[in-house]
């Protein structure tokens, strides 16, 4: 193994990106990726710690020092194999995981210098493998047991990937016409190209995972029939119901949930209209309510659809924005106007109920709340009207209650999430497991992957003891 650099000797390798002026005009991916030399240089910054704290921050338990060490030996395909031992979706995770809050936050190098760019190295390795490697056939003895996975998002795919390696017969049911869940309908092409998701799904198919699309458990398929057909079931149905702010005018024409807006553009390709059947209205001035990753995706999508002015309306300050730092930075580069310390009071409309603006309450930060974030407090008598012709609400989502309503034996919380055993993913119904946003509420892709893997282990333990 080549010697690692001394602490701080090599600066963090910045990944090149397309210019804001260029990328505002299309949906092509923004980061250009590391070259082999950049990846090699970045890998040398890793100290190969005896106690790898970075791994403590990875829900998928990727062996981070080991895959980076293989990059340092320029064994890029071996590095990809090492990641895929525990994570079936490295191309997605390398692009959309909040590494600054997880693995990179715990990087020892980061205590004094910039942390090792773990996410960018994962992205490099995944892309290198896709371009240079042939998929290896999975060789595993089948155990004769069948598992049904409901929902083909990150949690379901991760669960399927682990179970197929353990010898189970795995069938994934998906309500939509495309596999990938939020990776396909929620995250824009410029952040996660759909061909990458399709590639990783194809690898799962080659491993033996079976997929059935346009299948809605609880509607087109009876849940009890599924329980009889399969030895275990995993619920990875996500959190697809949008939350709204409940202010006057929310029913006006020109108000969208981020879910609808992004699904039209991402899943149905509306930005290509009239080449595709699904249209999208190209608004001139757009306000996005919220400050998370979905809000960033929505505002940057509006920019690419030709909006002259796009606002983020957020009730706290820049410091409290929950979105990934990279997404915030890219949105600012692309000209999005961030209106901090503003909360929506009313959506304004004309005589035909078309949106003409949003009235906001000026806020200030008060004492910290239960999560440690300072609570926004209204500044009495101070409001601001912002002229827009569209409002996109991106303040969160909740799980679809369809299965829970059909199967009252499945215990849920007040928020509609499944009650599970945190260690195994087991629900209140024997043989039924759950994970991802359906169990924890709207969260990140990597947390969903971690949940899917945990449930796969729980299912294996459960069926091994039957």
Where do the PLM segments sit?
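Ferredoxin-type iron-sulfur electron-transfer modules in oxidoreductases and energy-metabolism complexes
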Residues: 24-42, 62-95, 112-139, 265-266
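Iron-sulfur cluster-binding cysteine motifs and their immediate structural context
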Residues: 48-73, 92-125, 171, 178, ...
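Feature captures the FAD/FMN-dependent oxidoreductase FAD-binding
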Residues: 78, 141, 146-150, 198-247, ...
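Glycine-rich dinucleotide-binding loop and its adjacent helix/turn
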Residues: 125-141, 199-219, 242-305, 413-423, ...
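N-terminal Rossmann-like FAD-binding beta1-loop-alpha1 element of flavoenzymes
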Residues: 146-171, 295-303
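Rossmann-like dinucleotide-binding cores of NAD(P)H-dependent redox enzymes
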Residues: 169-172, 176-211, 299-346
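FAD-site-proximal beta/loop scaffold in flavoenzymes
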Residues: 251-283, 368-442
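A conserved FAD-binding loop/helix module that cradles the flavin
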Residues: 438-465
